[in-house]
């Protein structure tokens, strides 16, 4: 059915005059009206008028006509019998009627208890109209005892939707049930008792608001009035309930089929005292609590439904009860409880907006009788800000059989701000699992795809490129388990920072000193005497008693997985190296036992790595690709800007960028996986005489005649462990020369583009990029250098800034000596300078000077051990004039390495008798490096200043170093340290 509301504006000031002249009468509509049509068959017009003055509470004056006027009449249907209470004359008749009702209520309670025993859950929220009884005389008696005008309630035991009035009279083209003219204002939907100060959206007041409403799904739709003026607006009560007898008690726990919870009430209680809430199924109630098929609430907690009864006490008729804590029909907003998010005005005489009736979830239950309630669709809504007479709501009510909100979650915790200027639309397509009125609290989204386990840590992060102190920073004891994805130099376009393929890390590379290929970090604390202590978790060591000295394999692995070095020597797996000959294979096997091998990631595409191929931990696909690309001498060209993303999915899209990434990762066809593995004697073969013969088996019996000499005393566990510990200690205590040999960086590729012409700017830019990569390796090499970490951080940075050019040129001479026999300058495997390129680079004289150093290596037949110690001495060969912060530690470290070089020269078998001469030659070679480096720095500083004009690129690492070094060198603050006087 439909409900049409018409806007009615105030008719002017004469409305107040006509308001006061209206006679106080209740006009009963006749039953035989012929003006009813099919369209307005179920439409009613409730016109509520109030006199300007309120009638006193204790007024005993008035004629019987006035009493008759205050008794609302319930019109009955022609086809259904009804009880019409027209007049109660004597108190005797009231008592007889009360006794009859009490008896019927007792019978009802017995049946209810029996039914509730079997169907407790279904009966809790049942709205069957067959369980509704009347208690008229109790209400009349209660009003008489309290000195109020008598009011009459009458209802009938019949279905809700059929319990409607057919007696009509035509008013404003609609069907009018009753025109109530009393000093009390009524609500629109089965109106609750109102006061002239408090009115809802469909109350006729002096402002002249008329509303057309239908009470389709209710019974007993009539007002019972008391001359009490309510002090609280209907829509602004502290506890506002919805239709369907959903009560909000202080505990917010009440429904149709169960009593309101209060400290003094109990469930299914048949007797309710004034402070307690009467149960729906309680037939007996005190004079102050009259219950007709509904719950009774105290003045602070009002139970509402379709029809409203207002009195100073608590009276309920399956209806809304308006008391000092007034409540309204339908879904009404209050500052405390709002089930359907409807707005409400203030708590004073301001106007309040009450939406249409929305069924409560407590009115229906699965298995119980369903009562269809109207589903409302808002056509026109208005927002009132305190103006009483300017708000009317037009709504169309559509009776739909499936319009129940049976499973809507209308919890009491749904609190909407009462002064919100917006209202949620009434029409809600709720399902059985929808939650209306509950505030959504968004939880942070959890990533469903967790990060990969941190099996590989890359150190080529931005801090490595842009901050020298970041790499040399002090180690930290712990770090996050995530990984850093930027494992390649600048110029390679990386994946965005979204955790797509490479695990990401929030830890700078400076936090880790050494990392093995499995992802374990090691912090080296190297003393001035060259002894090394390694901090490692006890559970990772195979022998707990070996924690006093570090295994060599950890030192071997410490450099291998640094960024693009990536465990190129030992296949990424821990192995033992440099074990003396006197250590048996059983001892080696026992020491080399470790944990399971962790998974690795390909440095090129991010796929699972299959091993160390061509010096880099890569997958099999990148291994085959690199071999074919280099051996086939393919000149790949990138269709983009040489910055394509190379990953597991897109690695085949651009072979040029893939090859560039392979080269920058450090792949080399000539790379030796294990440069020094198995070189020493006794590693792969053992002398038979070193193996003690196994003892003969003991004789089976004395009669066998064999003699067996048993040991005098079997050694205990502690005594047997001492020689093993001493042997292992000697084996696993490396010398500085061993450490230097194992931490030596691998060869880095320059990433030279053969497709570009060999111009000076291209060659110089390529050399600068190569120098930037090599500087990252130099910094990490110095970080694990024995004794270098004992220096203050500022001293470490100063030494690297002063010696970076010397270290680069000395390493270039060594590579040229080893790979080309000093015929060419071997900058990188993909960048070798011959005479022609030396001229094209605009630095021919400097290239010739570096070539002369390489020729000296041939003349001296320099060994790798000598080269590594000499390189450390070059790191310590230039200091500031003012000295370092820790000059004593620096001098001690330098002296130790000079002694180590002297020992190395003495041990050389080819230099017997000539050790001092060789030592002199080696130190003279170190002195000659200073002159060459001065010329190289002068050229480098010039190109750095004129880089824009010369179009020469400098990487970020070189920019940082040169910017700090240039003013110090030009000011004469750098002081080279010579072995011999000039």
UniProtKB/Swiss-Prot annotation:
Binding, Zn(2+) 1: 602, 605, 619, 622
GO terms, molecular function: DNA-binding transcription factor activity; sequence-specific DNA binding; steroid binding; zinc ion binding
Residues noted as binding Zn(2+) 2 in the record, renumbered to the chain: 638, 644, 654, 657
Residues with the Phosphoserine modification: 249, 258, 282, 286, 298
Protein's UniProt keywords contain Endoplasmic reticulum: no
Post-translation changes: Phosphorylated.
Compartment annotation: Cytoplasm; Nucleus
Residues the record lists as binding aldosterone: 768, 774, 815, 943
Residue ranges constituting the NR LBD domain according to the UniProt record: 724-962
Biological role: Receptor for both mineralocorticoids (MC) such as aldosterone and glucocorticoids (GC) such as corticosterone or cortisol. Binds to mineralocorticoid response elements (MRE) and transactivates target genes. The effect of MC is to increase ion and water transport and thus raise extracellular fluid volume and blood pressure and lower potassium levels.
Protein's UniProt name: Mineralocorticoid receptor
Species this chain originates from: Saimiri boliviensis boliviensis (Bolivian squirrel monkey)
Gene: NR3C2
